[in-house]
Amino acid sequence: MAGQPSHMPHGGSPNHLCHALGPAPPPDPQRLPNTLSFRCSLADFQIEKKIGRGQFSEVYKATCLLDRKTVALKKVQIFEMMDAKARQDCVKEIGLLKQLNHPNIIKYLDSFIEDNELNIVLELADAGDLSQMIKYFKKQKRLIPERTVWKYFVQLCSAVEHMHSRRVMHRDIKPANVFITATGIVKLGDLGLGRFFSSETTAAHSLVGTPYYMSPERIHENGYNFKSDIWSLGCLLYEMAALQSPFYGDKMNLFSLCQKIEQCDYPPLPGEHYSEKLRELVSMCIYPDPDHRPDIVYVHQVARQMHVWTSST
C-alpha cells in the first residue's frame, strides 16, 4: 500500500494513549519483531466485559488505568492465524491506521504484543450497529425512510473519503462494521485489517460468513482496490433500502452467489419508495468493471446533496 511507514510511530506521538514503557528486549526470531514493547501492557487496563468475538479475536470493554478512559481492547490470536510476513504487514497497517483522525472513524489508540497476542486499543463504540437497525426495520415490516438512509450514508462516505485520501482501503465495509451512537453519529470500525484476520471478506470454503459484499474482482482474485470499497458502499446503500443484501438468496451456494455477483443480478429497488438518485447511485457503485465505478469523492458529493434535499422536504 502506498505511503506505509516502515515501522510503527513512536510512543511520544500525541495520538498514543499510553506512555513509553522502557527499552525493548532483543527480538526473538520466532516471534513478531517487538517494535511495540514501549506501548501499553495488559497491566494498564482493567478489563470489564467481553463485547464481541471473531474467529481469531475477542473484544473487551476496558478502562485504561493511566487516564481512566473507557476503551475497547481487541485481543487477536495473531500467532495462530498468519505467517511472519503477514504479522509484520499487519503491524505496519496498524501504524497507518493510527494516523487516521475523523469523527466518523473509530480511532486506533494503541497496540502492543503480549502473551503471544496482538492487543489493539480502540475508541469504544458503545452503541448499536447498522445491521441491528436493518434487522429492526425488517422485523417491523417497515422500510427505512430515505431521509434516514442518507443521514447515515453521508457520514459513512465522509469516513471512507478520509481513508481513501490517505491511501487507506477499508476492505470490509458492511452494516455490522458501521456503528451508530445514541446521538446518531456514525462510527466506521474494523478498518483495513480484514485481509489479516477476517474470514468473512474472503471466498470462504463454507457458507459460514458468506461474502455477500464480495466484488467481481475478488472472485477473479484480481486483488482489492479502492473501487472495491465503492462496490461495498453500493451494496450497503442497497441493503439499507431493501433490508437485505443485493445478492442474498435462500439455499444459495457459493458458486451461484458468485454468478449473481459477476452478472450484477439483483432485484431492483422499489421506485415508489426511493428516489431515482438513490437507485442510480446503487447501480453505479454495484458495477462489474471497477474502472467504471465512481470514486468516493463523487459518491460523497451525491450523498451530501441528497442528505440536504431529503432533510429539507
Curated annotation (Swiss-Prot):
Q: Which Pfam families match?
A: Pkinase (PF00069)
Its Gene Ontology cellular component terms are:
centriolar satellite; cytoplasm; cytosol; nuclear speck; protein-containing complex; spindle pole
> Which reaction does this enzyme catalyse, per its entry?
L-seryl-[protein] + ATP = O-phospho-L-seryl-[protein] + ADP + H(+); L-threonyl-[protein] + ATP = O-phospho-L-threonyl-[protein] + ADP + H(+)
Extract the ranges annotated as region (Disordered).
1-32
GO BP terms: apoptotic process; cell division; chromosome segregation; protein autophosphorylation; protein phosphorylation; regulation of mitotic metaphase/anaphase transition
Kindly state which keywords UniProt assigns to this record, in alphabetical order.
Answer: Apoptosis, ATP-binding, Cell cycle, Cell division, Chromosome partition, Cytoplasm, Cytoskeleton, Kinase, Magnesium, Metal-binding, Mitosis, Nucleotide-binding, Nucleus, Phosphoprotein, Serine/threonine-protein kinase, Transferase
Task: Name the family the entry cites.
Answer: Belongs to the protein kinase superfamily. NEK Ser/Thr protein kinase family. NIMA subfamily.
Its biological purpose: Protein kinase which plays an important role in mitotic cell cycle progression. Required for chromosome segregation at metaphase-anaphase transition, robust mitotic spindle formation and cytokinesis. Phosphorylates ATF4, CIR1, PTN, RAD26L, RBBP6, RPS7, TRIP4, RPS6KB1 and histones H1 and H3. Phosphorylates KIF11 to promote mitotic spindle formation. Involved in G2/M phase cell cycle arrest induced by DNA damage. Inhibition of activity results in apoptosis. May contribute to tumorigenesis by suppressing p53/TP53-induced cancer cell senescence. Phosphorylates STAT3.
What name does UniProt use for this protein? Answer: Serine/threonine-protein kinase Nek6
Upper lineage is: Eukaryota, Metazoa, Chordata, Craniata, Vertebrata
Gene name on record?
A: Nek6
